[in-house]
Amino acid sequence: MIKKLDNGNIQEKVAVLDYIRKLGLQSYLPALTVYFGSNELSVRFSAVSAACWLSSDKSMMINPLCLLIDDYLTLPPLRGIEGIRKNQQTEMLVRLLGQCCSELTYPFAFISGLPEYLQIIFYAHYANTKTLPLLLSLMEKEELSRIAFVAVSLITGIDIDDKEYLLPAKDEKLPEITSRLNVFGTGIGMPDIHKVTSMCQQYRNEERLFLGKSVTASWCNTNFSDGSQL
């Protein structure tokens, strides 16, 4: 496999890196780090994402993730399938960054500079109640309100279908699926910010939560099988 990584074409390198990730071959982790600086973005994506899953030292992944996310965001706009793939891979890297930072101090300045919908995705996967004020602030922006509500739900366990936390439904023209915001917000009611904020007041202590409970392997496994992802 090392020969394919060293001498293969882009598709072969990506295939080998994905194979290493899926099989959990931790012995290949040192070889993966060589490709963090690859000139090919798809190879870097596969190497960094594989290393995130394999490495027990998540702190080593924060800088490579930040650099790669930054490079994705500086790409020129892409259309069609390439544009969708770029967006999906960027979002996946942000999710991985949130998970790798979950027991560490996160790079606040970097996250604050991301597009706001990516900030929300990060906070959802960072899974810490200390970010609730930031999510509530983002929820005040109408175009972000629904996906920020989903992020709050993933941390606190609040039911996004509970009418107690939703504004009365009104007839409105559904937006065309022209942006990632529309994709994530589809089917989500408009939250009542005041009631959601009031509910969040109970989370005064900084703690890691997933759906209102401490983050443990068993709790995550219980929910990941049929849960949705932001």
Give residue spans per PLM region:
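Long, helix-rich interaction regions
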Residues: L5-K13, A31-S46, A50-L230
